[in-house]
């Protein structure tokens, strides 16, 4: 049974699963150890997302959507920022894009932020498994109320933020310098996300 996200999962079975994964010979001719382990991790993220349904959207964007967004932006080199980074899929695909085009992973610098603590930890693990260095801040936090990268000017902003959020606003944000084009409507965060993206572009 699919119980990846269930609190009652048997810790002994989980330990055995990790032992099994640890014993896999990561010596593929085509893929390095980090790539194989990363694919295993991505598989479980996908399975977890499927079992959780709509609720999983807070941390998981389908790989096909992520690939399309990255291919459109073509982040060959520079600073890549995702203010609602979920489990870090945008960063993984950006790094894959760079290496697929003859570059090196460190041709891009990765910056992100995630609101949910558990999802922030998923992102850190996802990137660590793949050897991708990233600055996701020292904690999970709200990009609107506590921007962890206030001075960042990125070459690329790539994100799938939570759309149509109605409770994003507070009076503390009224005169925020990010609202160059006017204060976004309090009842819908979409325009706030767009202005947040523009604010962080170089």
Name each region found by the language model:
Residues 163-192, 196:
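Mobile active-site "lid"/loop adjacent to the S-adenosyl-L-methionine
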Residues 1-76, 135-148:
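Non-catalytic, mostly N-terminal accessory regions of nucleic-acid modification and defense proteins
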Residues 11, 151, 187-191:
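Short, solvent-exposed loop/helix junctions and linker helices
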């Amino acid at each position: 049974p699919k119980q990846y996200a269930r609190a009652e999962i048997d810790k002994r079975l989980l330990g055995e699963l990790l032992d099994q994964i640890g014993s896999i010979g990561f010596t593929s001719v085509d893929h390095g150890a980090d790539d194989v382990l990363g694919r295993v991790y991505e598989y479980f993220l996908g399975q977890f997302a499927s079992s959780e349904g709509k609720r999983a959207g807070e941390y998981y964007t389908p790989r096909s959507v992520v690939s399309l967004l990255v291919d459109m932006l073509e982040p060959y080199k520079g600073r890549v920022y995702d203010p609602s980074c979920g489990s870090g899929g945008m960063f993984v695909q950006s790094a894959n894009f760079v290496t697929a085009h003859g570059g090196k992973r460190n041709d891009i610098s990765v910056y992100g932020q995630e609101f949910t603590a558990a999802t922030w930890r998923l992102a850190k693990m996802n990137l660590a498994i793949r050897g991708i260095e990233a600055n996701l801040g020292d904690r999970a936090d709200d990009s609107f109320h506590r921007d962890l990268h206030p001075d960042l000017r990125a070459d690329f902003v790539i994100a799938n933020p939570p759309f149509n959020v109605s409770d994003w606003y507070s009076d503390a944000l009224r005169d925020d310098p990010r609202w160059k084009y006017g204060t976004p409507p309090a009842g819908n965060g979409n325009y706030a996300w767009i202005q947040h993206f523009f604010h962080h572009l170089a």
